Amino acid sequence: SDEKHFDLSASGWAYFLYEWAGIPGTLLCGYLSDKLFKGRRGPAGFFFMLGVTIFILIYWLNPPGHAWLDNLSLIGIGFLIYGPVMLIGLQALDYVPKKAAGTAAGLTGLFGYLFGAVMANIVLGFVVQHFGWHIGFVLLTVISILAMLCFILTWNKRGQEQID
């Protein structure tokens, strides 16, 4: 609300729409990775993260007073971000023997939470507090691009294939 001048009610609705948009987005991402990309998780993750990056840039560069575009950007980010998160866990399950699936799922969940959710809040909060939202959005954009590069590394990999 500091930068975009949202009131508390509008912020609540924006957050609600962001979260709920993730449900169909995650389902679509999984469907595309299975059907369109024939079990390859990399392309679906890459294209969804490309969309996230675009919506982050739109949200960042949109001046205050255009709440509809801010909300559209947040809905777009919410729709697109949870699919790649799901694909990371799915890739871990795809790439390990069945007897190690529980361990792989547990470790990706643990490290995803510790280094993703917790560290992201700490690091982004620190950056924004000390350097401002401009640098915060630079950080978010760079991280989104790095995520796209990570998905490129698995572009042609499927299930139990050998990983180079």
Regions found by a protein language model. Give the residues of each.
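A late C-terminal transmembrane helix in Major Facilitator Superfamily
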Residues: 98-130
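Multi-pass alpha-helical transporter architecture, strongest
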Residues: 59-63, 89, 133, 138-164
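Short amphipathic helix-loop junctions that connect adjacent transmembrane helices
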Residues: 1-10, 128
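Helix-to-loop junctions at the C-terminal end of transmembrane segments
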Residues: 26-39, 128
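Intracellular juxtamembrane helix-capping segments at the cytosolic ends
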Residues: 82-97
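C-terminal ends and interior cores of transmembrane alpha-helices
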Residues: 50-64
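Cytoplasmic membrane-interface "Motif A"-like loop-to-helix N-cap segments
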Residues: 35-49
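A membrane-interface helix-boundary motif in multi-pass transporters
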Residues: 40-43, 124-143
